[in-house]
Each structure stands twice: as structure tokens, then as C-alpha cells.
Regions:
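CBM-like carbohydrate-recognition segments
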Residues: 11-14, 325-326
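Bacterial N-terminal signal peptides that target proteins for export
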Residues: 1-10
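Eukaryotic scaffold repeat domains enriched in small/polar residues
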Residues: 23-355
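N-terminal signal peptide c-region/cleavage motif recognized by signal peptidases
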Residues: 17-19
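Intrinsically disordered, low-complexity regions enriched for glutamine and histidine
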Residues: 3, 21-22
Length: 355
């Protein structure tokens, strides 16, 4: 009797333990999204980033790095491409001279206005939803936060609303404060800067380093704010996500695992670091976190609160369906579908959540 009761309790514990751990969501590639050809026979360059609005419209940042020979009768797509949930083009817009050649990230606010980060410039810009009006610019045109104001100057990380190679942006829904990951590449700034909705500098902080990892170049490559008051930053070169509170107090590291891609397959392990960009699942608790792991060329699915890796998917580097070539942007819509934008692959792929 005692042994039977012990076995029963053991079985109940196992069942409880299995249920206590989050089960990873499953996805299937949507072969019919987006609609091809896109727009008026458009050809895109590298897709530097993407974002999704509350109506599940997808905005692609087209870097237009296309040579005339690539066009072959096609037309160069505009810098900003808006797609509806069916994968059809709603509109395209954007002045490449204003946005620059390295548009890198975007964020859509609740009213539909869209923030765009031009990594090669010293500013970020806010546009009306249709792109017809630039509503705000933070940072002075032609000026960098450097010792001499130029691209060649030494980075300052100064207490002002000016940037030097900004990488990503997100907005606090409660306060309207703008969080900028400022420092996409070596030679630029390396900080998280917080700006008021009026464009006034509020505070900043660096990526967290200890004596053991002080030699790793701090490059904040992405930034996303969670519903529970935390700030998630891609510490790209250190292969991890760093988590802070809204005031910049360090909370913890979430390290990424990866299987290096060999040089023969066109990718040197550690060349850029694995933590590139992330997104959260659409539930209020944001149970899952999706991270582009650029070293393994996979999408990592993690349990957000614990940082535990649940699964990864992707069929390795390549240009076939379900493969990725330098994935650089990720988004999740209200239904839980995943979107992966590729810089060298020059496309976006959609993965539907399997019920």
C-alpha cells in the first residue's frame, strides 16, 4: 500500500513537472505570403528591419542596395513597404536621402505613427502612418554624437538627444518615453538612451560588463520593452540578451546557444555575434521570446521569464523556402504568426502558429 501511494505521488509529481514547463509553440511556413510579385513589379534590396502595427500590417525597411543590373525590367521598391495581413502591398513610401542607406529598425505606436531608425545617421524619425509627413526628428541632421560631430570623431555617449549609429527603438506605452539602442557598429556610441516624447534627453546607461567580459565590445543591437516593466537589449557580440529595469538597473543575462556555421558554408562563427533582434509573443504575459540567432542561422524560442531555450527552427543558411540568409528583423502579429526579414536574402517569410 505504501509503495503504491509512493508511486502515485511520483507520477503526480512528474505530470506536474511536465505541465510546469512551457511547451514551445509550433509553426508552419506560409507558402503564400507575401503576394508575388510585390507592388508594381518591385524588387527589394536587403530588408534591414521590420515592425507590425495593431492591425497586423507589416512594415518592411528596404535598404535599396540594388545595382541596375539586378533590376532586369523590375522597379526598385521604395524604402518603406506596408503589407496587409493577406500579404498584399498597401503602400510604399520614403525619401532615401532622408532615411539613409542603413535603415535598421522601426516601431509603430498605437496611433499608427511609425518611428524609423537610420543606423548610418545621427537621428531617428517619426512619420505619419502613410509616410506623408515627418512628425518629429530626434537628433540633428549631419551631426553625430562624436568628438567633432562627424562620423570620423570619437564617440561621446553624451547626455543629449543626439546619436551615433543608432540601432533600434521602442516606446513605453505608459509614458511615451522613447528608448534607443545607440551603437550598431564599433566606432559609434554604446548605450541605451531614453528620450521624452517631446524629444528631451532623460537618462542613459551602458551595457553591463564585469571584469571577466570587459574585453567584449558592447554593441546594443536591439531593444524591446516588455509588459512587466523590463528592457531587453541584444548584447550582440557577447551572444546574449541583457535585461534591465526602466531605470537601467541590470537584472540578468540570457545567454544564447548556437552551433557555429563553418566558413565553408559562408559564415564565420562569432563574426557578428548571435543576438541580433527579438520579439515577444502577443499574450499579456509575453510567455515566449523569439530571438534571431545569427551565428546558428536559426530562430530561438525561449521561455521569457526563465530564459530557457525551448526549441529552435530554421533549415540552415540558404535561399530556399524555410532557410535564412542573414536574418535581421523579426515580428509577431496578434495571432502569434512570426515574420522573419532577411538582409542578404532580400525577403520576408511568414510562419503561422499551429493550433
Amino acid at each position: 500500500m505504501k509503495n503504491s501511494r509512493s508511486r502515485w505521488f511520483a507520477l503526480m509529481f512528474i505530470l506536474w513537472a511536465l505541465g510546469a514547463f512551457a511547451q514551445p509553440p509550433e509553426y508552419e511556413l506560409d507558402l503564400h505570403w507575401p503576394k508575388i510579385p510585390m507592388g508594381d513589379n518591385w524588387l527589394t534590396g536587403g530588408i534591414g528591419g521590420m515592425c507590425i502595427d495593431q492591425n497586423d500590417h507589416v512594415y518592411l525597411l528596404n535598404r535599396q542596395n540594388v545595382v541596375p543590373a539586378d533590376l532586369d525590367g523590375a522597379r526598385l521598391a521604395p524604402p518603406i513597404i506596408e503589407l496587409n495581413p493577406q500579404g498584399e502591398v498597401v503602400r510604399g513610401w520614403g525619401d532615401p536621402d532622408l532615411l539613409g542607406p542603413r535603415i535598421h529598425d522601426c516601431h509603430v505606436e498605437g496611433d499608427g505613427s511609425i518611428w524609423i531608425v537610420a543606423a548610418g545617421n545621427g537621428y531617428i524619425q517619426k512619420y505619419s502612418n502613410d509616410g506623408s509627413e515627418m512628425l518629429m526628428q530626434i537628433g540633428e541632421t549631419g551631426t553625430y554624437d562624436s568628438s567633432d560631430g562627424s562620423r570620423e570623431g570619437a564617440p561621446l555617449n553624451s547626455d543629449r538627444a543626439q546619436f551615433f549609429l543608432p540601432a533600434a527603438v521602442d516606446v513605453d506605452k505608459e509614458t511615451g518615453d522613447i528608448y534607443v539602442a545607440d551603437g550598431e557598429l564599433p566606432g559609434g556610441n554604446s548605450r541605451i538612451a531614453v528620450i521624452s516624447r517631446e524629444g528631451r534627453f532623460l537618462r542613459q546607461w551602458p551595457l553591463y560588463r564585469t571584469n571577466s567580459d570587459s574585453n567584449i565590445t558592447p554593441l546594443p543591437h536591439c531593444i524591446r520593452l516588455s509588459n512587466d516593466g523590463l528592457v531587453y537589449v541584444c548584447d550582440r557580440e557577447a551572444d546574449r540578451i541583457q535585461v534591465f529595469d526602466r531605470d537601467g538597473n541590470f537584472q540578468r543575462n540570457i545567454f544564447l546557444q548556437f552551433s557555429p556555421i563553418s566558413a565553408a558554408e559562408g559564415r564565420n562563427s562569432g563574426e557578428r555575434g548571435s543576438a541580433v533582434v527579438l520579439a515577444f509573443s502577443p499574450d499579456q504575459e509575453q510567455e515566449f521570446m523569439f530571438v534571431i540567432n545569427q551565428n546558428s542561422v536559426m530562430i530561438d524560442v525561449l521561455e521569457r521569464h526563465s530564459g530557457r531555450l525551448l526549441t529552435s527552427f530554421g533549415n540552415g543558411p540558404g535561399r530556399y523556402r524555410g532557410q535564412f540568409t542573414l536574418p535581421h528583423g523579426i515580428g509577431v502579429d496578434s495571432k502569434g504568426s512570426l515574420y522573419i526579414a532577411e538582409q542578404e536574402g532580400r525577403r520576408v517569410q511568414k510562419y503561422n502558429l499551429v493550433d
